[in-house]
Amino acid sequence: MSREKKLSALGKSMGKQMIRSWEAPQFSLFSVVNCKNLIRYRNLLPVKMSYTTILVKTLADTLAEYPILNSSWDDGSKIIEHEEVNMGIAVDTKRGLLVPVIREAEKKSLEEIHEAMTGIKEKSWNGSFNMEELSGGTFILSNLGMLNISAFTAIVNAPNAAILSVGKMKDEPLVQDGEIVVGKTMTLCLNMDHRVIDGAAGAKFLTALVQRLEEIGR
């Protein structure tokens, strides 16, 4: 037996926003991260932090060097490169998908981002974010690794120019010093609005991000 489920105001708003976002010509780039140094770096931190926290910090630092990825499409008249990296974090809540924003993430230390992520986690249980906390994002990070997803693409949230999707860490065969060893890897997918970002710019950014993650703590 079927039953109707009326959309909430939030659901209606999200539906309209997804249609608007899907109208943008989007493309994807994938890259795999060798997580050996990332795991070691996290284990050596004096305070236990999530991988998402470390990703936010590394991503914000990389976006500051590649501002075209931290841009917005302004309805065909201009492209806006944002000075601040206002990082949206896609989270699952009782109210559905919400994207709280860490403002000026590029200026924050790892400890400050950890504090912000702790606050987001606490509010995610019941979705008790206010509109100010959910607005003004310039780039979104979506991590489904904890839900056992290996890799996925995400829709760029208009007017943003890009979104990064992160899959789970998994064991894979790797070539090291001419030998095959088992190592931890994770797949990153960068989805972009092709009106703002071309393939070369996206590739340079994603390569720089992967390099930062693989060399972290050195």
Model-derived segments and spans:
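C-terminal catalytic/motor cores of large multi-domain enzyme assemblies
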Residues: 1-218
